[in-house]
Amino acid sequence: MVLLDPLANALSTIKNAEAIGKSSCIIRPASKNIGNVLKVMQDLGYIGEFEFIDDGKAGIYSVTLVGRVNKCGAIKPRYSVGTGSFERWEKQFLPAKNFGALIITTSSGVMSQYEAREKKIGGQLLAYVY
């Protein structure tokens, strides 16, 4: 079986584990992109600690959940956003203003839309979380 979108799979694993009340979950396969998204989610306070575990294959992430994720998901296709168009995408993917976050990949790395707006840079949408 071929895994077409590892990021979407990782985010749905987190969402499902939160929905049934688990305190941790395992994400496999691991990638740098998934690790960067997890780091942004951790900085925003949606997940606790996470660690990379080398299993001899692609590796796995062990994620500690804190019960703050209501919904999260990958955004497909990866829409390009400019510095002035964040509000349009916030209205489309987030339930209310200043509630939740869009995760964006930029030339300066993966960050939330708040950080990208502060630095005045655009990029491509990866995911949303609230």
Swiss-Prot record:
Keyword Nucleotide-binding in annotation: no
Function: One of the primary rRNA binding proteins, it binds directly to 16S rRNA central domain where it helps coordinate assembly of the platform of the 30S subunit.
The protein's assembly and partners: Part of the 30S ribosomal subunit.
GO biological process: translation
Annotated family: Belongs to the universal ribosomal protein uS8 family.
Keywords: Ribonucleoprotein, Ribosomal protein, RNA-binding, rRNA-binding
The protein's name: Small ribosomal subunit protein uS8
Cellular component GO terms, alphabetical: ribonucleoprotein complex; ribosome
GO MF annotations in UniProt: rRNA binding; structural constituent of ribosome
InterPro entries: Ribosomal_uS8, Ribosomal_uS8_CS, Ribosomal_uS8_sf
